[in-house]
Amino acid sequence: NLWKYSLTPADGLENLKNYVNLALEGRRNKTSYPFIVYDKRTNQYAGCTRFYDFQQQHQTTQLGYTWYGENFQGTGLNKNCKFLLLQFAFEELGLERVEFRADANNNQSIAAMKSIGCKEEGILRLNCSSPVGRRNSIVLSILKIEWFQDVKQKLLKKIIEN
């Protein structure tokens, strides 16, 4: 289930409207930068992702609210998308840190984050409400220095090999 671990599920028309409105509100407030992901190979919209909790004064952001339709999962599209977003974050915006969070039970998302070079930092215990109650969140990140040392090249190699 695509929305099983989502803090803001977008299943159903009303939930989808709420999801989009929250993303647009964050954009207006300059705390969130949502992106629609388009797959050029299939000429189809595949999903979305966003920078959020953008803190210019600390040169940090979080990257998440990522989801892809079933046909796009496991295709390498996420790695391509994350490469471009991380490149933009570190090389254009000059950020020092990009943080990722997920439900600590969401093994698929955690594996995807680790596969792009994220390092696990720890677990925030019962840190937020979800549609099914309190949840633990895993925190991972990529630092600017790590991006330039090896994460960028390793991720690019994975993309090329795919």
Question: Which sequence ranges carry the predicted segments?
Answer:
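GNAT-family acyltransferases
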Residues: N1-T75, F88, P131-N162
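Conserved active-site tyrosine of GNAT-family acetyltransferases
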Residues: M113-K114, L140
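Conserved catalytic-core motifs of GNAT/GCN5-like acyltransferases
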Residues: R101, K119-G133
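Conserved beta-strand-loop-alpha-helix junction that forms the acyl-donor binding cleft
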Residues: F100-S109
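Alpha-helical elements of the RecA-like P-loop NTPase motor core of helicases
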Residues: I110-A111, Q149
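Conserved GNAT acetyl-CoA-binding A-motif
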Residues: E91-R101
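Conserved acetyl-CoA-binding loop-helix of GNAT-fold acetyltransferases
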Residues: G74-F88, A111
